[in-house]
Amino acid sequence: MKKKNIQTSVLSMVIAACMISHQQNARAGENPSLQNDSVPYVTMPDVSPKLTTGDGNPLLDFMFTADPTAVEYKGRLYVYATNDQQQYETVGGYGKNSYEYIKSLVMMSSDDMTNWTYHGIIKTDSIAPWIKTSWAPSITKREEADGKTHFYLYFSNSGDGTGVLTSTSPIGPWSSPLNHSLVDTNTPGIAGECKAAFDPGVVIDDKGKGWLTVGGGCARIMRLGKDMISVDGPIKPIKAPHHFEANELNYINGTYVYTYNIDWQDFSDWPLPTEKPTTCCMSYMTSKTPLVTKSWKYQHNYMKNPGDYGYDYSNN
């Protein structure tokens, strides 16, 4: 999964937290669009902490989170993350983190990228009892025929597959439109080829079509059905050199931009004329025709591992 040096930066959007008490609080009800109403299967705080610390880091100072994804809605940026705090509390503190107890997601938002409001926990295992875990979310939105904006929140159902939750509000209530993963390691195009079908990255292009990337040890891309909860056509490979995990997909001025985490190898077999990347870094590829495997071009190592900047080495 998209794991995990527990550091936080607005610039890199790598969300985590320091285990310290919070003193500054602001009621979510101050903004009419952020009422703390009762939402099924969402744990909402009575008082929502709102940080005003300098540059706004860490985004949440009272819990561990990771693997952020974000969507803009009505002038606010809504961020969703893996709830590492659930693992921490279940095992009783620090120790080997195998992530198996993480079955929820965290919500927060900001309208200025400095002051962050905590919107509570999405209880994924209550909404979708069939899941094993919920890690590394990816979200997108689209206005549908009913005139409402629909939110589509994809997540890793352990390493085996990718699930999806839907809502007509960025803070829920959320529902599970399927009683199983959207894709998993038994899905044609993934089965027998990828070690994992997790770490989703979703985007909707300027024609309104949804696209999803998944994979661990290899990368796969698929066009989503109009309903955003089905696959439309074959699943195709993206030949991402030394692929490890942490898939994400964006669409920028007609170009599909795929980002991923490179593995820990020494790259003596680096297959491209470009400069070799650094160990376990973030890299990106681009394409105009995403289902044509040969169209994907490796571009650059855009973010080195934290270890290259004097911090501890970690996955991504």
Which residues make up each language-model segment?
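Bacterial Sec-dependent N-terminal signal peptides
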Residues: 1-30
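Carbohydrate-active catalytic/glycan-binding domains of CAZyme proteins
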Residues: 29-316
